[in-house]
Amino acid sequence: MGKTKHQGPISTTKLPQPKHWVSPVPFGLGKVKPKHIRDTMKVAWENKDNLGYASRILTQGVCDGCALGVSGLYDQTLKGPHMCTTRLNVLRLSTMPAIKSEILHADIDELRKYDSTELRQLGRIPYPMIRRKGERKFSRITWDEAMDMIANKMKKLNPKQYAFYLTSRGITNESYYVAAKVARFLGTNHIDNASRICHSPSKTAMKRSVGVGASTANYQDWIGTDVLVFWGSVASNSSPVSTKYMLEAKKRGTKIIVINPHREPAMDKYWIPSNLESALFGTKVADDFYQVSIGGDIAFMFGIMKHWFEMEENQPGSAINHSFVKEHVNGYEELKTHAKAQNWDEIEKSSGVTKERIIELAETLAKSKNAVYTWAMGLTMHSFATDNISQVANLALLRGHLGRKHNGLMPFRGHSSVQGSGEMGADPFVLPGGEFDEKNRERIEKVWGFEIQKWQGDIVGVTLENIVLPEEHERKVKLYYMSGGNFLETMPDPDFVKKALSELDIRVHQDIILNTSTLVDAKEAVIVLPAKTRYEQEGGGTSTSTERMVYFSPEIQGNKNEIKEARAEWKIYVDLAKRVKPETAHLIDFKTGQEIRDEIAIANPNYNGIQHLKKKGDVFQWGGAWLCEDGICPTPDGRANLIPVEIPDFGKKEEQFVLTTRRGKQFNSMIYKEVDPFNGAGRYDVLINPEDAKELRVADGEAIVVHNGFGVFQGKAKFADIARKNLGVHFPEGNFLLPRGRYEKYAGIPDYNIAVYVEKAERFNARKDTQYQEKEIADDLDISPPA
């Protein structure tokens, strides 16, 4: 899709630039900031029983934390070693010993006293286990017993009645691919992955806008572009090494713009531990913040476009790249008419930003020859998320910010190799190399040698709802096979999720650790299978980064705490398939990771090159340095598409707030610090604008209640620089306020934003009888979910 190859890592600017310093006072003394040196020493202490193996993981393996793709200590963006706390925090998952048997086989209610953080710290799952209906403890079983029980159950079920789910906690492309193939081999299309609750709208929107659901740019494009826009992203928190790229970009003249309801401290200033200058004096990251209200991004972008078209009336070519649009873009006149028809009053009301401020950014972008637009959960976790992303693409296309150096669209991924999950086919809407459509299905059937069922598989949220369907329904899910994941802490309406998980006949947890969902009952049995980490996978494996770099991570020897009964994830899937359909097992019987990579290169032509990755440091980038290079997109006519979208109605009443969930110091739902080191917020603190708190007569730190017709959240007010009538609570603690069944209309992502009421706890508790409070909230206040 692009002819230019990535140039490899570049050198950093050596001379200090004090204008980017936070303070001349060294080490951020007196500032609220992470304690990186202390945290690093703590990690070393935690891994002291397996320090050699931990060191080899860090120096030889590909990071299993975020999606930057650091291989060993190096990457393809900047020369020099890289290390971050995200990677260090997940390190212990690969080095720790097994859970002690007296804890593992304790009464289930004793295990349920642990939260997920405490369960994670107990150690790894040592061997296959089962807990049948009515049993109070997990019992050890053999692999044969476990796999036969799962296979025999599947043989009795309609394939529409079992499902697979994979989450990206270090899962390799090989495992994703085999899982996708095995699911279809067994006759089910119910397979989904963690991107369903993060970036599925990005893929959907980019496919319709530019023809490809992946980043069109690479990280080096940040460095030297005129403007780098972060939309709904706290990249410095989720992927700390990215701050090195930001610092280098600033030194080369890049202006960094952050668009987010909350002025995230980590995007304001950061101390980069692996850069001496930044570690000493800090780095001022963002040059400007635009605090758009939750759900107001589409209106905000319409304001930018509206001003561009007003600029064009006075001076043609002052805002729109007409040559690029004429040669490479469809739908210009339709979008122009639609944008000009938008009303400034509605734009300001929806976005929460004044016309004057919107015009500032519009003119900045209009003057910028180059720009990279990157975004994350702040744009994708909405019921209108696909439209959010298409609107970002509209901005880039109108300016011609696509398909060349220092330009592009970049969905900022948060999990290692989650980019590869869909590209390997572990998604109900895709198969390797393309969509789940007739043409691609027939192509893959020839590669795989068996027929693929034509019916549409379900997304994870619908699969959970299908568990509670009537017994006779053909899509009532009775067996759920999960590689990692904890739906109790990632999906809306945790009470319903717990009920659904308990109504499965058999639930399989293939994982390295226990979590709270593992301890939920099932109607027949809960089966737990010990998986190997990516560093233990025989022959190594690959992972795909945000920028489409496919890295080889070698098998790393010498684990003193080796889990002898753990198996590579892809091998477990192969074993299952052979037991369910032994008569055609030869079609799925991979023996090595190399065999899998050889087939991936055929099944997904973009991955032609993966078969040559064999040792540490091996890497290739599918699609070249820039997708849509020279404006030529992988669409039927080779042109990009401008998509007119509508400003969404959030359904908020005047007295309500809009609440969003946010991450603190955590990796996905795995929490590593109870207090956010960037802003001092505890897990049950509610970020609120001081002016809003004043109107509610609430003091900083005072107990408040956030409620709606779906749930109640009791916390404390935490004054923060957040947009008016917006609230922030931590994920997953705030998930009780989110109802099930509200999905993004194109990609099926759950909506993680909701309208709520806020009041002092003493007033709430005085007004509501505890026994009936949720019923009374719904009845007395007549609350309905937002549209």
Predicted regions and their residues:
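Intrinsically disordered, low-structural-confidence terminal and linker regions
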Residues: 1-69
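Long, contiguous, secondary-structure-rich segments that constitute the structural scaffold
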Residues: 54, 556-613, 676-687, 691-787
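Low-complexity, highly charged intrinsically disordered N-terminal segments
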Residues: 90-137, 147, 174
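Long, well-ordered, tryptophan-enriched scaffold segments
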Residues: 96-110, 119-120, 253, 267-368
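N-terminal leader/propeptide and maturation segments of large enzyme subunits in energy/redox metabolism
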Residues: 105, 109, 132-136, 287, ...
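Extended redox/cofactor-interaction regions of prokaryotic respiratory oxidoreductases
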Residues: 121, 179-246, 252-276, 396-525, ...
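Glycine-rich phosphate/diphosphate-binding loops that line cofactor/substrate pockets in enzymes
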Residues: 146-162, 217-226, 249-252, 338, ...
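Active-site phosphate/pyrophosphate-binding segments
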Residues: 304, 328-461
